[in-house]
UniProtKB/Swiss-Prot annotation:
The keyword Plastid does not apply. It comes from the Bacteria. Keywords: Aspartyl protease, Cell inner membrane, Cell membrane, Hydrolase, Membrane, Protease, Transmembrane, Transmembrane helix. This is Lipoprotein signal peptidase. It is a multi-pass membrane protein. The keyword Hydrolase applies. GO terms for cellular component: plasma membrane. It catalyses: Release of signal peptides from bacterial membrane prolipoproteins. Hydrolyzes -Xaa-Yaa-Zaa-|-(S,diacylglyceryl)Cys-, in which Xaa is hydrophobic (preferably Leu), and Yaa (Ala or Ser) and Zaa (Gly or Ala) have small, neutral side chains.
């Protein structure tokens, strides 16, 4: 017998939609208002800078031809499927894990859309200190990192007792 979806972690899928809207909206604004390589200072140590990433994090495999586009798309789809299954198997009350999974799925889907639609991922956040610049990234990357950090954090938190779970 199947369980009602609202009692599962899938109840948190609305957060995937929020992440997607914010991520794709920010990328749309960059594509409409910036030429490749344009930079606008926001705050000291933070710029908006339009860059294209043909690889993965830190432009990993960016210069490997075109096969990595499909490789990373396959990884994103696989991760999304696994996390959706994990959300379905978890209770809606397991908030931290479900929020983490939703953030990762939303970020992965945002970058997957870019990869499939444009052939590259749109990056725009440039953090720097002095002359040192961190790799340019986007809001999808931020959601993925926050989700991963929440999963690690959850591993350090005390587990609820059987009484608290009931």
């Amino acid at each position: 017998m199947s369980k009602p979806l609202c009692s599962t972690g899938l109840r948190w899928l609305w957060l995937v939609v929020v992440v997607l809207i914010i991520d794709l909206g920010s990328k749309y604004l960059i594509l409409q208002n910036f030429a490749l390589g344009d930079t606008v200072g926001l705050f000291p140590s933070l710029n908006l800078h339009y860059a294209r990433n043909y690889g993965a994090a830190f432009s990993f495999l960016a210069d490997s031809g075109s096969w990595q586009r499909w490789f990373f798309a396959g990884i994103a789809i696989g991760i999304c499927v696994i996390l959706l299954v994990m959300m379905y198997r978890s209770k809606a009350t397991q908030k931290l894990n479900n929020i983490a999974y939703a953030l990762i799925i939303g970020g992965a889907l945002g970058n997957l859309f870019d990869r499939l639609w444009h052939g590259f991922v749109v990056d725009m956040i440039d953090f720097y200190v002095g002359d040192w610049h961190f790799a340019t990234f986007n809001l999808a990357d931020t959601a993925i990192c926050i989700g991963a950090a929440l999963i690690v954090l959850e591993g350090f938190l005390p587990k609820p007792t059987a009484k608290e779970q009931a």
